[in-house]
C-alpha cells in the first residue's frame, strides 16, 4: 500500500478510536457473562481481592482463590459459598414460580477452590498453577491482585523487603501469566486483569520500592497487551486497574493537605472494585479511579518537573506518605519491644 494512503488510513483509524472512546463514556457497553468460567484471583484473602471474589461469585463464575494466608482465604471462600447458596435458593424459587419451564444455571454446579500460595516465589506459583489445571481446569479470567508495601524510606528499608515488594507486586505477574496464558493463546479466549495503582503512573516520596514495582507491572501489562495485539489474539482481553489511594488499611495514615482531602478522599474499597468490574466486564483496556487520575497522569507527562513539584507541594502530595511510614515504624518498634527484641 502507498505510504501516503496508509498514513491517511491510520489517521482515520486514530480519529475513529477517539469516537469509540467517547461513545463508551456516553453509552455503557453491555457487560459480558462470566458464568461458569474459571476465575483465579491472587491475594483473595482480604482487601480488594476478597471483594473481587464476591463480585465474580455474584456473576456465577467458578472461583480459584490464592492467598498466602490460609485462614483469610478460607474466610473469603465461605463468603463465596454463601452467595452461591443464595443464588441457588433464588433459582429454585424462580423454577417453582415458572413451573419448571425456565432453564436456569444452578449455582450448585459452581464451586470455590482455595490454594495457599506465595506468589512472590516462582516455583510455588508454577506448582500451584499445575494443581489448579489438574483439579479445576483451565483458567479463563486471571486477576493479578496480590500486593504488599514495606512502608520504609529507601535508606531505612532492608534489602530483603525491597526484593519482597518487587517479587510480589511485579515479578508474580510474570509467573502467573506464563502459567496460564499458553492455553488462552491456544483457544484465543481469556482475560488478564492487572491490579496496579495510581503510583504506577506517577510517584511520590518515601515509597520508592512500591512505586518501582507498580511502574514495572504497568509496563509489563502494556507490553503484554501489545504482544497479544501483534499476535492478532483479539479473543484475549486485558484490563489495567489503577486506583487512587484505597481505604483498605494498606496505607493507613497517608494524608494529603487537609483542605484538599475532602475533594480527593481515599476510595471506598467497594466502589473501587465495582468500577473495576464494570471495566473488566466491558473489556475496557484501562481504568483509573477516580477519573481525575487521568488528568494528573497527563499533566505529569507534559509539565516541567519543577511545575510538578509545585503542584505536589500545593496538594500536600510530596510528603503524604510520611505519616504512614511513621506509623509503620512505630508499630514495628512496639512489636519489637513487646517481643523483647
UniProtKB/Swiss-Prot annotation:
Q: In which tissues is it expressed?
A: Detected in retina, entire eyecups and in liver (at protein level).
Q: Where in the cell is it found?
A: Microsome membrane; Endoplasmic reticulum membrane
Q: What protein name does the entry list?
A: Retinol dehydrogenase 10
One molecular function GO term is:
all-trans-retinol dehydrogenase (NAD+) activity
Major localisation: membrane
Catalytic activity, reaction form: all-trans-retinol + NADP(+) = all-trans-retinal + NADPH + H(+)
Q: Give the family this protein belongs to, as stated in its UniProt record.
A: Belongs to the short-chain dehydrogenases/reductases (SDR) family.
For biological process, the GO terms are:
animal organ morphogenesis; bud elongation involved in lung branching; ear development; embryonic camera-type eye development; embryonic forelimb morphogenesis; embryonic organ development; embryonic viscerocranium morphogenesis; gonad development
Membrane topology per the entry is: Single-pass membrane protein
A Pfam match = adh_short
* Species lineage: Eukaryota, Metazoa, Chordata, Craniata, Vertebrata
Q: In which pathway does it act?
A: Cofactor metabolism; retinol metabolism
Under InterPro entries, the record lists: NAD(P)-bd_dom_sf, Sc_DH/Rdtase_CS, SDR_fam
Its function, per the record, reads:
Retinol dehydrogenase with a clear preference for NADP. Converts all-trans-retinol to all-trans-retinal.
Where does the record place the catalytic residues? Answer: 210 (proton acceptor)
Amino acid at each position: 500500500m502507498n505510504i501516503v494512503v496508509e498514513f491517511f488510513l491510520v489517521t482515520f483509524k486514530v480519529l475513529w478510536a477517539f469516537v469509540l472512546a467517547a461513545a463508551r463514556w456516553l453509552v455503557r457497553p453491555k457487560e459480558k457473562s462470566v458464568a461458569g468460567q474459571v476465575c483465579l484471583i491472587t491475594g483473595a484473602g482480604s482487601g480488594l481481592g476478597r471483594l473481587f471474589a464476591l463480585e465474580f461469585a455474584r456473576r456465577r463464575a467458578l472461583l480459584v482463590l490464592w492467598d498466602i494466608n490460609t485462614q483469610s482465604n478460607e474466610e473469603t471462600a465461605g463468603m463465596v459459598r454463601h452467595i452461591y447458596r443464595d443464588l441457588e435458593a433464588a433459582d429454585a424459587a424462580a423454577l417453582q414460580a415458572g413451573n419448571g419451564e425456565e432453564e436456569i444455571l444452578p449455582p450448585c454446579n459452581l464451586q470455590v477452590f482455595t490454594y495457599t500460595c506465595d506468589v512472590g516465589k516462582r516455583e510455588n506459583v508454577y506448582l500451584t498453577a499445575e494443581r489448579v489445571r489438574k483439579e479445576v481446569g483451565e483458567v479463563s479470567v486471571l486477576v493479578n491482585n496480590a500486593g504488599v508495601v514495606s512502608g520504609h524510606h529507601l535508606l531505612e528499608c532492608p534489602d530483603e523487603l525491597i526484593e519482597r515488594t518487587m517479587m510480589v507486586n511485579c515479578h508474580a505477574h510474570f509467573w502467573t501469566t506464563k502459567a496460564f496464558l499458553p492455553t488462552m493463546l491456544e483457544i484465543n479466549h481469556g482475560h488478564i486483569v492487572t491490579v496496579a495503582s495510581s503510583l504506577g503512573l506517577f510517584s511520590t516520596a518515601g515509597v520508592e520500592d512500591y512505586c518501582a514495582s507498580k511502574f514495572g507491572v504497568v509496563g509489563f501489562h502494556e507490553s503484554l497487551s501489545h504482544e497479544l495485539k501483534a499476535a492478532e489474539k483479539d479473543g484475549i482481553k486485558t484490563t489495567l486497574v489503577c486506583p487512587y489511594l484505597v481505604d483498605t488499611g494498606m496505607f493507613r495514615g497517608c494524608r494529603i493537605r487537609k483542605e484538599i482531602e475532602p475533594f480527593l478522599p481515599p476510595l471506598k474499597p467497594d466502589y473501587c472494585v465495582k468500577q473495576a468490574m464494570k471495566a473488566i466486564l466491558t473489556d475496557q483496556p484501562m481504568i483509573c479511579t477516580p477519573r481525575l487520575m487521568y488528568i494528573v497522569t497527563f499533566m505529569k507527562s507534559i509539565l516541567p518537573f519543577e511545575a510538578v513539584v509545585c503542584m505536589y507541594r500545593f496538594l500536600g502530595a510530596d510528603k503524604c506518605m510520611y505519616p504512614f511510614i511513621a506509623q509503620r515504624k512505630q508499630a514495628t518498634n512496639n512489636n519489637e519491644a513487646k517481643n523483647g527484641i
